[in-house]
Amino acid sequence: MKKKCFKKTVSWALSIVMSATMAVTPVLADTFTDGSQLIVSEDAGEETPAAAISDAEDEGMMEPEHTFEIEDNCEDSGRTGFSSENEASGFSDGSVLAAQTEEKAAVYLDPSSGNDDNTGKSATSAVKTLSKAVELAQGGDIFLLGRVEVDSDIKLSNVTFRPGKSNMSGMLYISRGKVTLENIIINNKTPDGKSCQFSNYPIEVTGRLATLTIADGTEIGPFPGNSCIIVSHDSTVNLNGGKILGDKQNTVEYGGGIYAEHATVNVNGGTISGHSATYGGGIFSSYSNIKINGGTISDNQSIRGSGIYAINDSNVSLKGGSIIHNKSGQGAGVYLSISKLFINGESCQITQNTVTTEPSPKDMRGEGGGIYLIYSEAEIESGTINKNTAIAAAPDENGNIQGGLGGAISAKYSRVTIKGDTKIRNNSAGNRGGAIYTEGTNNDSSLLNIEGGTISGNHVNGSGAGIFAICSRGNKHNMDVNISGGTITNNY
């Protein structure tokens, strides 16, 4: 009789116990030719859905699975054959093939009172340094009992950082050096599975010598009630991959994913999603430079600026990536106040974002489905602004309609230039400006320059399917529209 046997010689004098282990690895119409312009005469009282300019009253603003290779027939020698399945198998001598799972280590790190001579196996035997904790963890969990300061170049890989207690000031404080996180998980779950309350930001990057790079496989968040990362004082955060996650349930005031002040944020890949904030669901920027070259900012919500909220002389540059499926009251994709926006990337997309007036038009203005600007400038040379929506509220008792302004862009007291091969298409508004709504006043002028691009397939339930321009108070010359190129067609 012949049975299967292993290639390698096995000593049958010994009872054999085989243990299979598994490693766990942790895991942002009408065509206008050059020189032409369609402007409605106020005296004639005519209006065209493609472009309208009028005066109006003021409006409310495992490791791989190990299998044992079995082959070759051999003579029966009284040995009992066994399989490579992960189960107990009997031998003729009564020994057992056992399958076992080895759990990864959990290490406690206390930067204040820990000692690297300790085992790190409990809070009372915590180690002191990050390097020792990483060494002992071997890809497992590191429970932080205090905020860890990083002030030198370091690359962290294949571990999970969790709070070791229910109240902490923060988790990582990066004051200098280049810090890279690869296949890192940082979350809010304490050893007993509850959430930690932070008095400061979970991750803080500060100072001009500090750079945090988030690479593939990294997951940061959620941190309910906190921004995930603050970057300040001329420091830099690079999101090259991974995820910065929110839970959509707990609202922070500023910047659910990243809060940037006097800093630089480069998004080259990865995802920022699921955040809820009053201002800036994905990214909040004040006096900062935000550069989006790739990645995705999606499924965030806020009152203003669900994707990006930029104020105070911030510069926002979009050369790639997607800002998609965000929901807000104003500027669901991008919101700018006293700031500048540059869009110049064929692959850049601002799409399927929605502004609404719910639950209250007082806060949720329903303006700028893709982009909202106030006292700001935008230069759009390429990219696509597509399928964004500005929803209007139902008319009040006096018949006035709130919101529904600018399906793609709403610009107040701002300067907007559209040129190149920009595509603004298939956007919709519930009141005015299916594609673009722009407004000036007696004291605050607005300027819309259309030098190129295509505005097509946009829809409005009210006026100005392509463009609606208005001077809401005073001198109508404070609202200028210059069309010297491009195509405006099939808007309805």
Q: Where do the protein language model's features map onto the residues?
A:
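Right-handed parallel beta-helix/beta-solenoid
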Residues: 31, 35-45, 59-60, 65-131
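N-terminal secretory signal peptides that target proteins for export/translocation
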Residues: 1-6, 41-43
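Sec-dependent N-terminal signal peptides of Gram-positive bacterial secreted proteins and lipoproteins
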Residues: 7-28
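Surface-exposed loop/turn motifs in large extracellular/passenger domains
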Residues: 139, 150-157, 172-190, 201-224, ...
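Glycine-rich repeat segments that build the extracellular carbohydrate-interaction surface of secreted
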Residues: 107-111, 128-150, 155-164, 214
